[in-house]
């Protein structure tokens, strides 16, 4: 079993495509904000801590995600920067860091558990990434894999073309 598990929940996205003034993670499904569904899926994994990365100026999200800690991303510089921001609070920890998107309310504890278990093998991968195949990838970033199926790079949707 993994000795240490921490969770980062990325909740700093503005949700521009939703055409709403409300942050994407605060929209509700079944009476709960999206971000709360994600946190509820993480809790059964019993992480040492959960840190929710939020955008500057939206500190009230902290009330919604309690008792999870919050980390403010001062400048919205993308997903990678949000992870870097959240990891700053976890530098002294060892073990696995689970990174989840706060606007993915359908993620299940079982799926997250399988991702963690993928790191509990001999010679584990440094990174386990959850992705999906779609008929129409135009709206999504890309996970580019090498010939062995290993992650080569992640391409943001704004930088992707039909080759990626």
Language model segments and positions:
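Conserved N-terminal catalytic core of the sugar/cofactor nucleotidyltransferase
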Residues: 1-6, 28, 32-117, 122, ...
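Glycine-centered loop/turn positions within well-structured domains
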Residues: 16, 24, 59, 126
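Extracytoplasmic/periplasmic beta-strand context in beta-sandwich domains
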Residues: 24-25, 141
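Short glycine-enriched loop/turn motifs at secondary-structure junctions
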Residues: 20-21, 100, 164
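Conserved core of the sugar-phosphate nucleotidyltransferase
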Residues: 66, 107-164
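N-terminal nucleotide-binding beta1-loop-alpha1 segment
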Residues: 1-21
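Short beta-strand/turn micro-motifs composed of small residues
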Residues: 11, 54, 101, 131-132
């Amino acid at each position: 079993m993994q000795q240490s598990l921490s969770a980062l929940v990325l909740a700093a996205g503005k949700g521009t495509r939703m055409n709403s003034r409300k942050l994407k993670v605060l929209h509700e499904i079944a009476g709960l904000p999206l971000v709360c569904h994600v946190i509820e899926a993480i809790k059964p994994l019993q992480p040492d801590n959960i840190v929710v990365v939020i955008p500057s100026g939206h500190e009230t999200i902290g009330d919604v995600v309690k008792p999870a800690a919050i980390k403010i991303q001062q400048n919205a510089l993308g997903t990678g920067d949000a992870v870097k921001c959240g990891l700053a609070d976890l530098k002294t920890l060892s073990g696995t860091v689970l990174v989840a998107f706060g606007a993915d309310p359908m993620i299940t504890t079982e799926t997250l558990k399988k991702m963690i278990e993928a790191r509990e093998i001999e010679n584990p991968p440094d990174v386990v990434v959850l992705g999906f195949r779609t008929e129409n990838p135009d709206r999504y970033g890309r996970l580019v894999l090498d010939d062995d199926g290993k992650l080569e790079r992640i391409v943001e949707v704004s930088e992707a073309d039909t080759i990626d």
